Amino acid sequence: MKVITLLTDFGLKDPYVAQMKGVILSIAKDVKIIDISHEVHPQNIEQGAFLLYTSIPYFPKGSIHVAVVDPGVGTSRKGIIMDCKDYTLVGPDNGLLVPAAKRCENFKVYEIVSKKYVLDKITYTFHGRDVFAPIAAYIANGISLADIGRGIEDYMDFNLEFGKVCEDKIEGKIFHIDRFGNLVTNIEEGLIKRYIEYGKEIDLIIKGRKYRVKFLKSYGYSKEGEILLTIGGIGFLEISVNKGSASRELGASIGDRVTLVL
């Protein structure tokens, strides 16, 4: 059974995600559809790219990943397929898919050109349902990418910005905030552990305010209500509050800069 995943900024209040799933199942009846997230901040391509990039390794080989964070929908921007060794990516040509594609050594990019494998009526504002969902379904059914599109090299490139060391500081930013209010940063586990040991106290600067915090293995090693640093399940530094919300406590938002003073 083929797996098709969905990642969007559509939310679940409206019928958009359900319509995409309906289109997929009308074409490929035996696929398994899995939601990665539909709570990407509206039009935030970087956040969407990060969530896709960090989710890819946990799906079976041959999975088809549809990602739609598409502020340029209905314009001249292309729809593309990125063919990687172990998975396929479908979505808009705006950089959203590229970090996930770069996880594999080599990939090919196809511009979606065939009208045969999309809906008869394509709206200007909902290519997720009208283009990308049916394309993913037909790929799951075994239609070759060469029949759907043409190979291109002029796709929009994009690289995620990861945390880095600047003199005696580690600089990063918030990529994502989960439902617990944890601030998921772009600072990778390997970088943190190169400079900071578990149990060490350091200064955290965020939104111009300084906090003295500990780097701990998990929440339970801190006191209730205490701010802490930990490595989250996807391998990046998170700023948390034990049994609380770091987002609310620190007044932080996606895109805010984070500084750790070594």
PLM regions: where:
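A conserved acidic, glycine/proline-rich C-terminal tail/linker
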Residues: 186-251
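General beta-strand structural signal in soluble alpha/beta enzymes
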Residues: 6, 33-36, 67, 89-92, ...
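Conserved active-site and cofactor/substrate-binding residues in soluble primary-metabolism enzymes
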Residues: 15, 19, 28, 43, ...
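Short acidic, Gly/Ser-rich segments with clustered Asp/Glu that frequently serve as metal-coordination loops
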Residues: 10-14, 72-74, 177-182, 244-246
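N-terminal glycine-/serine-/threonine-rich phosphate-binding loop
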Residues: 1-76
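Active-site histidine-anchored catalytic micro-motif
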Residues: 27, 47, 60-62, 67-68, ...
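Anionic-ligand-binding alpha/beta catalytic cores of soluble enzymes and soluble regulatory domains
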Residues: 119-187, 191, 196
